[in-house]
């Protein structure tokens, strides 16, 4: 008996994607990684992608450069105009994330979806440890952080797969 088989990846349908992946809560990042057969590694990479997404929400610098070249003149009795425009843009993220944890993980087809959120309270602790801020600034940041974390907890209670 001789068998030939052809395998293909299951098609990812939008109805299968977790609700929290489409409309992720504030202070959360989404990681999606195509499985390679080793769940531990796949999970780690998906979490890393989620942290990268989260860091991009917190601090992103956009550097752009536009080069414009224009030339005009006359060649063999004919006028000519030449324009060239180039645009280069780079998004840079550099953030230290204290207390980010994966709060939801779901495998859909060949993809690992991970929701990585700031752990309630950890951001507040990190702010409290900042020495560069005066006492009033730290207190105000802690208050805002507490409010944001309470909103996050409330949102997470209402999120289902």
Enumerate the language-model features and the residues they cover.
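Domain-level marker for long, solvent-exposed, non-transmembrane regions
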Residues: 6-161
């Amino acid at each position: 008996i001789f068998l030939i088989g052809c395998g293909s990846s299951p098609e990812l349908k939008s109805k299968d994607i977790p609700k929290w992946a489409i409309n992720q809560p504030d202070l959360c990042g989404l990681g999606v990684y195509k499985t390679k057969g080793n769940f531990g590694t796949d999970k780690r990479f998906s979490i890393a992608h989620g942290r990268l997404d989260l860091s991009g929400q917190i601090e992103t610098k956009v550097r752009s450069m536009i080069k414009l070249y224009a030339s005009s003149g006359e060649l063999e009795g004919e006028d000519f105009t030449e324009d060239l425009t180039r645009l280069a843009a780079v998004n840079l993220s550099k953030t230290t994330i204290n207390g980010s944890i994966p709060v939801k993980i779901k495998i859909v087809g060949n993809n690992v979806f991970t929701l990585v959120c700031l752990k309630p309270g950890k951001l507040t602790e990190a702010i409290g440890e900042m020495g560069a801020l005066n006492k009033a600034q730290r207190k105000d940041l802690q208050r805002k952080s507490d409010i944001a974390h309470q909103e996050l907890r409330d949102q997470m209670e209402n999120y289902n797969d």
